[in-house]
Amino acid sequence: MSRSCELTGKGVQSGHNVSHANNKTKRKFLPNLCNVTLISDALGQRFRLRVSAAALRSVEHRGGLDAFLLKADENELSMRARLLRRQIVKKAAEAA
């Protein structure tokens, strides 16, 4: 299980701790990942995803998982999220 968000691709970054004396030591900045269950209205199913807190706020802001995935750039999504996006697009095409 990698330390990256399945929806936004946000991952581990590296940097420095900087002391008062300006000494620099290497450190990692980890994303705030949460295991959440999101519901797809189009598919009528629940999906368990590992997403960052920022991505969770973005999903809520866009109006749900379906709207987020349809608007998201496919290159940033994980393989699971890409498959989910394709299923939603297919289901929307059938309904139209």
Swiss-Prot record:
Keyword Ribonucleoprotein: yes
GO CC, one annotated term: cytosolic large ribosomal subunit
Keyword Acyltransferase attached: no
Disulfide bonds: none
BP GO annotations: translation
Region listing for Disordered, in residue ranges: 1-24
UniProtKB keywords: Ribonucleoprotein, Ribosomal protein
Gene3D superfamilies: Ribosomal protein L28/L24
One Pfam short name: Ribosomal_L28
GO molecular function, one term: structural constituent of ribosome
Top-level taxon: Bacteria
PANTHER family (alphabetical): 39S RIBOSOMAL PROTEIN L28, MITOCHONDRIAL (PTHR13528), LARGE RIBOSOMAL SUBUNIT PROTEIN BL28M (PTHR13528:SF2)
Homology family: Belongs to the bacterial ribosomal protein bL28 family.
Designated name of the protein: Large ribosomal subunit protein bL28
Name of the gene this protein is made from: rpmB
